């Protein structure tokens, strides 16, 4: 696991962070001796009455701070990156990708294709599961991150590989079983492409997806709308 440097961007007034004399530009290195991978590690490790923080001050000094607090209390700080990690991008080339259809000259962030299960939980984004590792699945189950929103497109593995232009897209469907067995609530989405994943293929997909109810709470059908 890589070590991330978490730079504080703001310290809230009358917070634990202010009492500890934390400042914007300080970096959180660890909590209770554990590296902090992302915001979920941060929240999980902070949920304790006694925590030990390792902070690197702007001048390079390292402070070890012992904190006694209420179990659910936060430091009251904000970080430069709210996810506290890099956003994971999509490795697929879907035949219907709406980002590929966007006109040039727009805000740069609009062209970023995210496929990050953490953003699925935090912001409701849909993920394809193709870049989700066993480690990611373990963390989702450990932290009870649900619901996770999944772009299925089809439950036919070969067809899914074709639609996503990713030879691993069919195998990724096995991860749904892990989420189901871990009691991780899911919502589904199928982008419906005429003559490809409709009719018999759609009926097959819906039949297979029904096996995951009630953990899979919904499946939305989104008719594709390609533009030139």
Regions found by a protein language model. Name each.
Residues 16-21, 43-44:
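Short, surface-exposed secondary-structure edge patches
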Residues 34-42, 61-64:
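Short, Lys/Arg- and Gly-enriched loop/turn segments at beta-strand edges
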Residues 40-54, 69-72:
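Short, compositionally biased
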Residues 60-62, 69-216, 223-228:
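Conserved Radical SAM active-site core
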Residues 1-12:
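PDZ/PDZ-like groove recognition
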């Amino acid at each position: 696991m890589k070590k991330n440097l978490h730079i504080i961007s703001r310290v809230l007034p009358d917070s634990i962070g202010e009492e500890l004399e934390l400042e914007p530009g300080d970096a959180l290195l660890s909590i209770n001796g554990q590296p902090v991978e992302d915001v979920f590690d941060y929240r999980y490790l902070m949920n304790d009455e006694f925590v030990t923080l390792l902070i690197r001050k702007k001048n390079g000094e390292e402070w070890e701070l012992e904190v006694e607090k209420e179990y659910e209390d936060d430091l009251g700080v904000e970080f430069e990156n709210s996810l506290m990690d890099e956003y994971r991008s999509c490795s697929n080339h879907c035949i219907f990708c709406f980002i590929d259809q966007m006109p040039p000259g727009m805000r740069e962030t609009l062209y970023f294709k995210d496929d990050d299960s953490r953003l699925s939980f935090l912001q409701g984004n849909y993920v394809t599961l193709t870049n989700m590792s066993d480690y990611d699945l373990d963390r989702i189950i450990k932290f009870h991150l649900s619901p996770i929103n999944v772009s299925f497109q089809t439950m036919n593995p070969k067809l899914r590989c074709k639609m996503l232009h990713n030879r691993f897209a069919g195998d990724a469907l096995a991860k749904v079983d892990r989420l189901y067995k871990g009691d991780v609530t899911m919502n589904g989405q199928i982008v419906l492409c005429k003559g490809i994943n409709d009719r018999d293929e759609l009926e097959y997909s819906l039949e297979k997806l029904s096996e995951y109810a009630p953990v899979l709470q919904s499946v939305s059908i989104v008719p594709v709308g390609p533009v030139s």
